[in-house]
Amino acid sequence: MKKEKILVLNFGGQYDQLIVRRVREMGVYAELHECDTNLSEINLDNLAGIILTGGPQSVNDSESPKADSKIFDLGVPVLGICYGHQYINYVNGGTIETPNLAEYGKTDLKVDKESCLFKDIPEESIIWMSLNKQLSLSTFRSVLPYSARFGVSIVPPFT
């Protein structure tokens, strides 16, 4: 049996290599590609999931990076981090807004340990946040009611 792999699509964020390394340290092969790589150029055998990295742009910008929307049809879980989170919402018809006050810096994170997404993350951590865009929670839920698509607007505690 071949080893499962995670496809990491880079949207221009600064943590792409760190994400790949952390996935590999968990015993899962991770492969990094630029977000606009055509899926036909990627070996999708044994694909277990996809991670969409962060990036400095907003999906609302006409020149912002885009991925092949067929990634959502591959039948594997997709995790969007920061920009990747916005992108999942955007591709599925959601909207992204600019809040009145943008913030960046360290903050405390408290997670629900019952969520499969956070089960191996400490209940409390200090994380980096970059909040200059927001999604409406009701929009995100109505766009993706029952799917293995996750998004976080923080840089998870990789270090």
Can you name each region flagged by the protein language model?
Residues 65-81, 86-159:
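Pocket-forming structural segment of enzyme catalytic cores
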